[in-house]
Amino acid sequence: FRGTVVIGEGAVDEAPELYVGEELGTKQGVELDIAVDPLECTDSVANGRPNAIAVIATGTKGSLFQAPDMYMNKIACGPKAKGAIDLDASVKENLSRVAAKLGKSVPEMVVLVMDRPRHEALITQIRSAGARVRLITDGDVAGAIAPSLPDSGIDLLMGIGKSAEAVLAAVGIKCLGGELQVRLAPKDDVQKQVLRDMGITDIEKKLSIEDLAKGQDLTFTATGVIDGPLLKGVRYTSDYCVTHSVVMRVHSGTIRFLETQHQLK
């Protein structure tokens, strides 16, 4: 294959490897877009907190949204609540709609939110509506995918996070049949000009999962580093370590969970 990194570790002058625009593979065969985060949640790993993964998503050329390095407003739900979320609706309205789809009351709902000062008002609105909040310090990708996992205990993700993580999550959510809506949130005129330079003129457009990850030829692969809602972290014994991974494909709907032993000696 001939792959091009469309979401990676930064621009060519910011990262020695996996930089945006880097070509990977044999440079022959099918052309692919590659989105990669070799370690999502570096702070979590450094501080022993949960929810760290290594993740890569692929799609045919032109299928993955080439997200600029800025924030997005996000809302994500699982397959059973598909069609109920709306980024333009109020927090209370989204909670009521999703609860109705899931056959729950709003007080039974659990919403995942990143623990950031920018989310203080959002957290207040969720709790005022009667729902519960689950705070995470990091882990936007696994966090957005969590509502699509049947045993995660998470019904919704809400809040503001990085655009690169939104694209990675979009592929995973699409594999699982969930829904994600986002909107770019440039912080100043400089970032707005960056968007215009990229050809993005409708900054206020509500982007669907199909805008972020087009078509069916998409794959999502992740391995857990530290335990999180999606995967277990690495386990060590005296002779080997055990990793837990997931490999998903949109076209076939295949979801494979792998437990692998790696010999250390």
Language model: regions and residue ranges:
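Short acidic loop-to-helix transition motifs that present clustered carboxylates
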Residues: A11-D13, R118, T137-A144
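Acidic beta-strand-loop-alpha-helix segment within the catalytic core
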Residues: V55-L135, G228-R235, C241-L264
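Gly/Ser/Thr-rich active-site loops/lids in small-molecule metabolic enzymes
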Residues: A131-V141, I154-L156, I160-G161, E165-R196, ...
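Short glycine/serine/threonine-rich phosphate/pyrophosphate-binding segments
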Residues: P38-N47, A52-A54, E120, V141-I145, ...
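Flexible, acidic active-site loops/lids enriched in D/E/S/T/G that coordinate Mg2+ and/or position polar
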Residues: F1-K61
